[in-house]
């Protein structure tokens, strides 16, 4: 998958949190480069966001990841982002989604040590598949958000046989022109997931939540709105 240009200036965000570099997050492959958007001391949850495939330039600075972070941070939650093994300054080598699941678990362990509160997970594309696999069934994770969940990508196997064990509330958001998530295939994947669950289609959006020829302009704000609305309904965040 080729990523849309995704680098954003970190300090342009409008959320009240501060951004801190994390130096003590380590997985089986070594140190993982990470950023924490700090939250309120009394925040009921912490949040973790995972990035898309590095072969297309995916990092924790990806636009979709950044906007998901903003949605979560708007409720005062501390939000952790990190680069998978072999990406940016993270040690190790890319492992096609296998070792990356251990990276997610290492991030959950770090959050458990530092926050002592339940976690909400969000991931985009490759990051959604890897993160859902790692988080499903983990009692520390109380909510799951899959953004641009990939169900058809040439040369990669994105299977979802694990979904039946994902019993916590789930939100899936895809563009109705997602080139890696055809509607009929994505709806079949969604059917495998148990309730509670919600699937939202963003009209005129592609895989990266950018616009189409018939509906130009990025749809990232719409994606953010859907995340916020769901968090308010499911978790009572305000």
Stretches found by the model and what they are:
Residues 153, 176-181, 207-208:
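Acidic catalytic loop of the alpha/beta-hydrolase fold
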Residues 205-220:
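Catalytic histidine-centered segment of alpha/beta-hydrolase-like enzymes
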Residues 123-131:
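Gly/Ala-rich beta-loop-alpha elbow adjacent to hydrolase catalytic centers
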Residues 94-114, 133:
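Alpha/beta-hydrolase active-site loop
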Residues 2-42:
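N-terminal cap/lid segment of alpha/beta-hydrolase-fold proteins
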Residues 192-209:
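Catalytic histidine neighborhood in serine/cysteine hydrolases
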Residues 40-81:
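Short, surface-exposed "cap/lid" segments of acyl-processing enzymes
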Residues 165-167, 171-174, 178, 202:
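Short beta-strand/loop motif that positions the catalytic acidic residue
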């Amino acid at each position: 998958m080729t990523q849309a240009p995704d680098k954003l200036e970190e300090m342009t965000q409008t959320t009240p949190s501060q951004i801190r570099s994390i130096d003590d997050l380590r997985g089986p492959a070594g140190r993982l480069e990470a950023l924490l958007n700090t939250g309120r001391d009394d925040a009921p949850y912490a949040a973790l966001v995972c990035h898309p495939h590095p072969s297309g330039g995916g990092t924790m600075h990806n636009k979709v990841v950044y906007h998901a972070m903003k949605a979560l941070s708007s409720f005062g939650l501390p939000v952790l982002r990190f680069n998978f093994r072999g990406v940016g300054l993270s040690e190790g080598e890319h492992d096609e989604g296998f070792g990356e699941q251990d990276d997610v678990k290492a991030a959950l362990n770090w959050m458990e040590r530092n926050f002592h509160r339940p976690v909400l997970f969000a991931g985009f594309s490759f990051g959604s598949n890897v993160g859902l696999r790692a988080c499903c069934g983990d009692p520390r994770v109380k909510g799951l958000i899959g953004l641009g969940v990939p169900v058809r990508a040439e040369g990669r196997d994105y299977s979802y046989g694990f979904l039946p064990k994902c019993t916590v509330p789930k939100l899936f958001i895809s563009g109705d022109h997602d080139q890696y998530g055809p509607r009929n295939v994505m709806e079949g994947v969604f059917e495998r997931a148990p309730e509670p669950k919600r699937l939202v289609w963003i009209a005129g959006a592609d895989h990266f939540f950018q616009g189409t020829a018939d509906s130009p302009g990025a749809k990232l704000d719409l994606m953010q709105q859907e995340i916020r609305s769901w968090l308010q309904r499911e978790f009572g965040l305000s």
